[in-house]
């Protein structure tokens, strides 16, 4: 008897136009997955990422959605599944910062980061889990940060959002393990992206000095971990946190 062929998997990456999100899209495409590149405002960058994925021999689309809105997340997941006939992988990567010291931080500053980084992941995960549960297969990966583990001055909002992602994924992992759906978290350290490039030179130098490997990581380093957790062969790994930090958290 011939074994049934494994279907081509499809992935949705939020905040997929640039940085870690773009690298994740390309890494998953290199594994043969069709890719939905979500973006909020950078349409040209998202279309370029989708085109680069197609150059790797897969289907890819760019989908605009504001992950702060639950109805937009539901529609985003439905559109991604409709584009490819299924949805197997969700990467919650969309994130923002609004750094200020505690006494200067307003409620609006705090809410803006929580709404995108944490609530956006909740909304997308809830919508995707419904589909994945029915097909009895799914991989959900959220991009946290070492800041969510260790904290950082001037980032109470960001730290709270990234710590929240770890708890969110562990709880989802327990709820959906019996349905063939895994939920894991990656925690990047100091990674060279547009966000870190905007830091003062002295701050970047200090961050690099705190890394045992002596240098910042690349988006591709994080993407490799995401692709690992999104794969067929890692179905017995769930509820875990994988740090990609060059030893920074030791």
For each predicted feature, which ranges?
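Conserved glycine-rich cofactor-binding loop
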Residues: 10, 17-19
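The beta1-alpha1 cofactor-binding region of Rossmann-like NAD(H)/NADP(H)-dependent oxidoreductases
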Residues: 43, 64-76, 107, 220-221
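Short, small/polar-rich loop/turn modules that mediate ligand/substrate recognition or access, typified
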Residues: 86, 177, 182, 237-239
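Substrate-binding pocket helix/loop in short-chain dehydrogenase/reductase
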Residues: 101-102, 106-114, 196, 207
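Active-site helix of classical SDR
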Residues: 125, 161, 169
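Alpha-helical segment proximal to the catalytic Tyr-Lys
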Residues: 130, 174-178, 235
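Residue(s) in the substrate-gating loop at a strand-loop-helix junction
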Residues: 145
């Amino acid at each position: 008897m011939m074994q049934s062929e494994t279907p081509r998997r499809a992935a949705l990456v939020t905040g997929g136009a640039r940085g870690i999100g773009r690298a994740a899209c390309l890494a998953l495409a290199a594994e043969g997955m069709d890719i939905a590149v979500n973006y909020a405002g950078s349409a040209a960058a998202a279309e370029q990422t989708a085109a680069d994925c197609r150059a790797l021999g897969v289907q890819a689309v760019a989908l605009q959605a504001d992950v702060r809105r639950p109805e937009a997340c539901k529609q985003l997941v439905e559109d991604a599944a409709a584009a490819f006939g299924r949805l197997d992988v969700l990467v919650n990567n969309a994130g923002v910062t609004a750094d200020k010291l505690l006494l200067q931080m307003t409620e609006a500053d705090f809410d803006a980061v929580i709404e995108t980084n944490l609530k956006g992941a909740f909304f997308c995960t809830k919508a995707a889990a419904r589909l994945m549960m029915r097909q009895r297969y799914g991989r959900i990966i959220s991009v946290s940060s070492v800041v969510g583990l260790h904290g950082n001055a001037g980032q109470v909002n960001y730290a709270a959002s990234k710590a929240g992602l770890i708890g969110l994924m562990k709880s989802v992992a327990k709820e959906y393990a019996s349905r063939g759906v895994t939920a894991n978290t990656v925690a990047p350290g100091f990674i060279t992206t547009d966000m870190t490039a905007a830091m003062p030179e002295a701050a970047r130098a200090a961050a690099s000095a705190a890394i045992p490997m002596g240098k910042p990581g690349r988006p591709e380093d994080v993407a490799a971990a995401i692709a690992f957790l999104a794969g067929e062969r890692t179905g017995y790994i769930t509820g875990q946190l994988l740090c990609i930090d060059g030893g920074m958290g030791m």
